[in-house]
Amino acid sequence: MGAFSALQNYYDVPLHVRAQQLGYHVSNVYILLNDERGLRENCPDIYQNLITCRHNRDSRTIMEYGQDMVASWIFEDDLIEKLQEAGLDIVKSGADKERLILATSNVSSGSDTKVRLGVRSVFMEIMCDYKGYWTRYHRADLRDNKCLRLQREKALFLGVDVANKKYMLIDFADEVQATYNPSHFAYGGKPVYSFDLKNYRLKEFDYDSIARDIIALI
């Protein structure tokens, strides 16, 4: 189950309506409605960008891949807004911050957000588990290149278990406890670092608590 399937009933309105409420580009509405013809005819540049992402889509069609991408943006944007309301100075910083499907060659690996506290600032990566994998297996897996980048940036990692309404924070400015796995089936045989959740506890999801925990780490 990807973001699109998991979030179908998450909001009081359909996802394409939520996208419109957030002011998303019409291309994202076509994607959420699985209207490939409308996307191809009315947003040809976006459609071509989506096609270039074929290698990222696993067994999904290009439209299914796009639906998961746009649905995850909706959840992230709502999360960011709620954290701002809770007093956190947080802004989007990634290549996809404009919420448009980019050609794969233009997608960078930078962190999703930047959090500021006075003159201090830190990058923060947001990752969501829509299937409850972390709770079920008591571990979270990060691609090796993402993990190494977070260490270089001394970034924060905010993991949200959407299925079980939990969250965790990892401060990559500190030495992290992770096990290297050179080949993980869920990532197409690519290497990952696995984080044992005995060391990184999942907490009950609450926006105020998340904001306080982040501020305490900056």
Predicted regions and their residues:
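Intrinsically disordered, low-complexity terminal regions enriched in charged/polar residues
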Residues: F172-I218
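Mg2+/Mn2+-dependent nuclease catalytic core
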Residues: D129-E153
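Interdomain/boundary linker segments immediately adjacent to catalytic/signaling cores
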Residues: M1-G87
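Active-site metal-binding core of divalent-cation-utilizing nuclease and nuclease-like domains
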Residues: S93-R120
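Short, flexible/disordered intra-domain loops and linkers
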Residues: E64-D68, R99-T104, G132-D141
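Conserved catalytic cores of phosphodiester-cleaving nucleases, focusing on short active-site segments
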Residues: L79, S111-G132
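A structural signal for short, well-ordered beta-strand segments and their strand-loop junctions
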Residues: V91-K92, F123-E125, F157-D161
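Nucleic-acid nuclease catalytic cores
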Residues: R149-Q177
